[in-house]
Amino acid sequence: SKTTPLDIVLVLDVSGSMDDDLGESTWEYTPTDEQRWSYSDINGSRWTTYYFRDDDGNYYEVEAESDGSWGNRQYSIGYYTGSGFYRDWNQLGTTSRNQNANLWTGTLYTRQEITTSKMEAMQSAVNGFIDQVAENAAGADNDVTHRISIVKFADDSYADSVGNDRQDDYYAYNYTQIVKDFTTVDAAGVQQLTGAIEALEPAGATSVDYGLTLAQDVLDGQWRHDGGEWWVEDPTLTGARQDAKQVVVVFTDGEPNHGNDFDDDVAATAVNLAHDLKNNGVTVYTIGMFEDADPDDIRDNFNKYMNGVSSNYPNATATNRFGQASWNFCNLGTRVTEGNYYFAADDAEELE
C-alpha cells in the first residue's frame, strides 16, 4: 500500500549550551610521512608523541629506551603492552650504540582528540533523518510526497519572518524563528533543508514553548504572536495538508527556560502546547540530548517534562484549577501501551 504523506516540523534547540561537548571524546590517528626512526627521534620529540599500530588496529605509545653504562649504552625504541607488573616490552627494529642511528623503518602515527558538540551531533542526526525521509519518499513502492519544516528556538522573542536571524546586540542571540516553511523532500529540497541545518549556530536561551508555538503556526499556516493573543494570516506559510500525517520532532539538551536553569513556567507551557498539538492529531517526538536523559523516568523534572511533551503521554497537561499553566499541577495521565516517542541520545552514535 502507498505510504501516507508526512508533514514534519523539526523543532531544534539552538541555545548556547548546544555548543557543549556531547559524550566522550575520541582519538583520530594520522600516519606520519617519516619512515626511518632513531632513538633521538622518539626521545627528542618533547611536544609530539608517536604511536605504533599493530595488525589488529590497536595503537601503542612508542617509547625510547637506553640500557647500559655510559660509553657502552645501547639505544632502542618500542612499546609496552599489558599493565602494571605485567607489562611486556615490544622492541621495534634493532639496537645501536649510536642514538641517531636508524633503528626501525616503518609508519608511526600522531593523534589528536576529537570532540563532537551537541549542535554538531544534532545537525548530523537531523541531516541523516532528512536523507532517510527522502529515500522513503522515492522508494519504488512509496511514490509519495513528504515535506519538512524547520523551526529553531532559543531566545524568548520571535522573528516574524522565515529565515535564520539573530538579535542585533552584543550577544547576538538567536531569535526563535521559522527557518524553513514546509519544503518538499526531493533532491532539491534535501539540499535546501540540509543547508539550512548546517547554517544553525548555538546562542541564546531554551525557549521551547516559543518553538512549539511556531510549530503550531507552521501546521496551521498562520502566525501566532504575543503568546497566542492574536493571529495574523500570512500566505507565505503553506500549512499542513489535510491528507498528511502531521509530526513534530523536538530536539533539546534539557532545561526549558527563558534564561537559565529549569523554568517551571516554561516547562508547563510547553506541556500544554504539546497537548494541544496531540489533541489535534499531531504525533510529537522528543529527543533529549542531556546527561541522565531517561524515557523510563517520570520523577525527575527533565524526564517528566520530556515525556509530557511527547506522545508517550497524549493527555499530559500542566494547568491549575484557574486554567493557568503550572508545573506543580503537571499530570501526565496514562502512558500509551504501544510505541515510544521520547528518546535519549547522549552521544553522536545514538543520535544517528
Which residue ranges define each predicted feature?
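P/S/T/G-enriched low-complexity
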Residues: 1-352
